């Protein structure tokens, strides 16, 4: 946000943001930059979107600082799943609907052994997928193969909380095509489960 950056106009700025599919600084280089700047006697602020310890690589950076003997503090943020859910009017939990919510990264291919999509499908709990837009068709296929009904309500929220926010609601089996037709791009989150149906019930009473 340029307005936030402007508050520190006299500071030295290092842009290390990441976007899927675009060239970016590797995480080890970011870790070392933090250590080097702190070692040079500078007060360093690592500004992140969302919560640094939830798919934000904050743990990697904190560990690098710890190993280098650099003291630090962590300020909590609002993770994208919470912010996007509220902005898209999709309650992540609802009495009588679910008692848990799964947060998972879709950055790797759906066939990656690091994520057991069949187990997630069998859990019966709704989920929010971070960084999964590029692999959405693979993820949907893996969840369906794991037993999740292709008719399961599914939504994609792009640029949630921002002026260009766009929300697409479909089903698990059709969401990849719906997202492509709508022209959604990163950053986007995917919501899967009956919680998505609550959006249609709540929207009519939403204040402008």
List where the protein language model places each region.
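Short hydrophobic/aromatic-enriched beta-strand-loop microsegments
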Residues: 12-18, 69-73, 92-102, 147-156
């Amino acid at each position: 946000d340029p307005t936030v950056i402007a508050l520190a106009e006299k500071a030295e700025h290092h842009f290390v943001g990441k976007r899927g599919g675009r060239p970016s600084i590797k995480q080890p280089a970011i870790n070392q930059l933090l250590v080097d700047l702190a070692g040079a006697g500078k007060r360093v602020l690592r500004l992140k979107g969302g919560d640094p310890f939830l798919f934000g690589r904050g743990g990697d950076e904190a560990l690098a600082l710890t190993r280098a003997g650099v003291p630090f503090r962590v300020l909590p943020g609002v993770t994208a799943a919470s912010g996007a859910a509220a902005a898209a009017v999709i309650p992540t939990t609802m009495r009588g609907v679910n008692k848990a919510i799964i947060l998972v990264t879709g950055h790797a291919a759906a066939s990656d052994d690091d994520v057991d999509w069949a187990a997630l499908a069998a859990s019966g709990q709704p989920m929010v997928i971070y960084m999964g837009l590029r692999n959405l068709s693979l993820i949907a296929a893996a969840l369906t193969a794991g037993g999740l009904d292709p008719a399961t309500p599914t939504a994609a929220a792009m640029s949630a909380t921002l002026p260009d926010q766009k929300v697409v609601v479909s089903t698990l089996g059709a969401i990849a095509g719906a997202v492509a037709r709508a022209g959604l791009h990163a950053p986007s989150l995917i919501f899967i489960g009956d919680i998505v149906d609550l959006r249609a019930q709540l929207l009519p009473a939403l204040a402008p």
